[in-house]
Amino acid sequence: MADLIKETRVENGWVRGVAAADPRVISYKGIPFAAPPVGALRWRAPQPAKDWEGVLDCVRFAPISMQCKPGTDPNNLYTREWNVDPEIPMDEDSLYLNIWTPAKEKDERLPVFVWYFGGGLMEGNPAEMEFNGERIARRGIVVVTINYRLNVFGFLAHPELTAEAPDAPTNFGLLDQAYATKWVKRNIAAFGGDPENITIGGQSAGGRSVQVQLTSPQTEGLFQKAIIMSGIRYGSYQGVNSHGMNRTLEQAEADGLDFFQWAGIRNLAEARQLESHTLMELFRNYAGIGSGLGPGTKMWAPVIDGTFQLGHFSEMILKNKRHMVPLLMTNTSSESWEMPQVQTMAELETLAKERFGHRSGEFLSAVQGENLAQTLENAKYCPMELGMRLYFEATAAEHPELQNYSAVFDGDIPGWDHPGTFHSSDLWFVFESLASCWRPFTGRHYDLARQMCSYVSNFIKTGDPNGKDVDGSTLPEWKSYSTCKGQMRYATPCKQLDDLSVSPVMRFLTDFYLHQIG
C-alpha cells in the first residue's frame, strides 16, 4: 500500500508534514502563501512568498494575526467555549495556511475545502480547536484553513493608500483570502487535491467573506461551490438593515483619516513605522473594544472599493450578480431572532405602517394572536433564515437548475450554562471536533456530529449533501430548497422540514422583501 504524502513540493520549495492524530491523515501547518505584510507591505495587497532552501517542516500553526486576544474569562460564553490561549503567538507576519490530506498519491484529485474563520473581521484564527480538519479529511477531502489580516491591519482605508495603489486601496483581509485560495488552486495537486473542485466556506464573518468572494470579479472560476454558515442577516423591525455591512471607499477613507487624527498619526509613512502591538493598542482604544461601541466599530467591514468589491455583496447576490455555483447555507435555531420592540397594539400598528406601508394589514394578519404577548411571539423571526430564503428565491427565479441547500442547527447543547444553540455552536459538529470541547457531549451528540460532517463532506465532493454517512449507512434525505422551500433540521434525528413548517410572518417577510428588491 502506498504511503501518505508526507513530503511534497509547492511553488516556493519543499514542505514536510506530520501524521495527524488519525494516522490516515497528514497535516501541514504553517505553509506561507504570501510574503510577510510588514514594513512597506503593511496595507498593501498580498505579495508572492519568497523561495526557501531545503525542506520546510510544517508541524505547528503559524502565529495568529494581530488582534485583541479575548483571553479566558470563565464568565464569557465565547472565551469559555474556545478557551483561547492568552499566550498564543501573535504576529503581523501571519499569512500562512494549513492543510490536512488523506491522499496517498498526488494524482488522486480529491475534492478541496478552503475555510475562512469568523470573528467579526476583528479576531479569530485557523488554529482554534474546533477547526481541526482531520475528520473532514478522513472522508476523502483535502482541507485547507487560512489566516488573513484583521481589524485595522486588514481593513484600513485612507486617501494616501488609494493614491498609492488605486487597484487595491483596502480590503486587505479579503484580498488575503482570495490570494490564499488562488495559491490553493495552483498548488493543491501536490497534496492530492483537485484544483478544479474547490469549495470555499466560512461562518459568521467568514460567511460574510464567502459572500464577498462570490461577488468579486477577481475570483471568477476560482471555486465551484460555497458554504455560508450564519453569515447573512436581512431585515429588522428597528429599521436598521444589517444585511450589507459595507462602506463606500469614501466613507472608509473618512474613517481612516479620523483614526489617524485621533491617534496623532501624521501620515501613512509614520503609520507604517509604528510597532504592530502599538498600532493594535491604538486601534483598540479608538474603537472602544471591550468598553462598548466606539467610533471604530465599522473599520473592519468590507469596503466597496470599485475593484475587488463592486457593490453591497448581499444586494449583488439578490440580483444574481454572483458566481453561479451551488450554495449550502445554515443558521442555528437560537441565534439572531428579531421581535418588535413595542408595548401596545397601537405601537405595533404604527411600526407596521412605518416598516411595511400599504402592506401593514397583511403583516398584522400574519402575526395576530389572542393578546399582545402572543402576537409579538408570532412576529418573531430569524433574519439569517430570511436572508437565506431571499437568496435562494432570487436564484430560483433566474437559475432554476441550480440546486441550493439550507439547514438549521437545532441540536441540544449540554453544559451547566444551558446556552441553547448559540451562534457558532454548530462548528463543533460540522468539523466533528466535539472531543476537543469541555462540554459533556454524549453518544447522540457524536452521532449528530458524524451526520453533519458527512452531509457537508458530500456537498464538498459533489454539490449534493445526500449520500452515505461515514459509517456506510444512507443519510436521511435532504431536499434542495427549490424542491421543498424548507430546511434540513440538524437534530437527533435529522429531519427534512417542508414549506408547511414556515411561519406566516416568515412567508410575509420573504414576499415583502422580494417585491421590494424588485
Predicted regions and their residues:
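Alpha/beta-hydrolase active-site loop
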Residues: S94, P166-A189, L249-A254
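Substrate-access "cap/lid" subdomains that shape
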Residues: R186, V212-T215, E220, M229-S230, ...
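Alpha/beta-hydrolase fold nucleophile elbow
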Residues: F191-Q203
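A short, hydrophobic beta-strand element of the alpha/beta-hydrolase
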Residues: I200, I227-M229
